[in-house]
């Protein structure tokens, strides 16, 4: 028998074995990550409940409108879902991406400035995690109007994972980097996702 054929067959079997091993490891990773997301979000809600109450009262006292701001974002599979945030802007604020604002200070409330600077406005997203719409770590979900970024993420399969409260692109630049740079970091996370990287 041709040694080359034997080698190719062995290589293909090894590849199949590697794929099965990867699938198993990926399943374990996703399962444990989901459990940790649920546990951490419940603990977070309990521990941060005094802040939730105080911020809710301050928002209601300062301006008209709901305490919680709901906005459609692109989630896993690019499917839209409502993300929750403490409302930090006036109700007449245009529905555009943060980095597209030229005069955002006009729309931000006084309490809004504080909760944005400290990222307290993101706390309600713990409920998104409980619902299964988000994870603690993952690519940040973008508004549906950011079509270019959504399509770019699709082309790299980044939309196959749950969006997160924080992600690799946020740590490496947040709104100070362009779409291509964001996708580069998100893709790097996708290809190397692990508990070590999540930490």
Where are these regions (language model features)?
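Hydrophobic structural segments characteristic of membrane proteins
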Residues: 1-19, 127-198
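Hydrophobic alpha-helix-in-membranes signature
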Residues: 49, 65, 123, 138-140, ...
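Cytosolic-biased juxtamembrane loops and peripheral soluble domains of multi-pass membrane proteins
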Residues: 25, 92-110, 114, 140-147
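Residue-level signal for the nucleotide or nucleotide-sugar donor/cofactor binding architecture
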Residues: 106, 118-121, 194
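Short, glycine-rich, amphipathic interfacial segments at transmembrane boundaries or analogous
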Residues: 7, 69-107, 165-185
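A hydrophobic, helix-centered structural microdomain
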Residues: 8, 20-92, 128, 195
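Short, well-ordered beta-strand elements within core beta-sheets of diverse protein domains
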Residues: 111-118, 187-191
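Short, conserved beta-strand/loop elements in beta-sheet-dominated catalytic cores
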Residues: 113-135
């Amino acid at each position: 028998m041709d040694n080359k054929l034997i080698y190719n067959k062995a290589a293909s079997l090894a590849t199949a074995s590697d794929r099965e091993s990867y699938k198993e490891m990926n399943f374990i990773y996703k399962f444990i990550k989901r459990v940790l997301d649920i546990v951490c979000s419940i603990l977070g809600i309990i521990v941060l409940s005094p802040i939730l109450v105080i911020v809710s009262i301050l928002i209601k006292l300062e301006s008209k409108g709901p305490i919680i701001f709901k906005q459609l974002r692109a989630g896993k599979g690019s499917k839209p879902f409502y993300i929750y945030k403490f409302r930090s802007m006036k109700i007449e604020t245009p529905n555009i991406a943060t980095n597209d604002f030229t005069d955002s200070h006009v729309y931000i409330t006084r309490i809004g400035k504080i909760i944005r600077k400290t990222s307290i406005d993101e706390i309600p997203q713990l409920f998104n995690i409980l619902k299964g719409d988000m994870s603690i770590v993952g690519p940040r979900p973008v508004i549906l109007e950011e079509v270019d970024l959504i399509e770019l993420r699709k082309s790299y399969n980044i939309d196959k994972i749950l969006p997160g409260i924080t992600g690799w692109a946020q740590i490496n630049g947040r709104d100070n980097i362009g779409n291509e740079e964001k996708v580069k970091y998100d893709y790097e996370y996708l290809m190397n996702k692990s508990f070590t990287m999540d930490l």
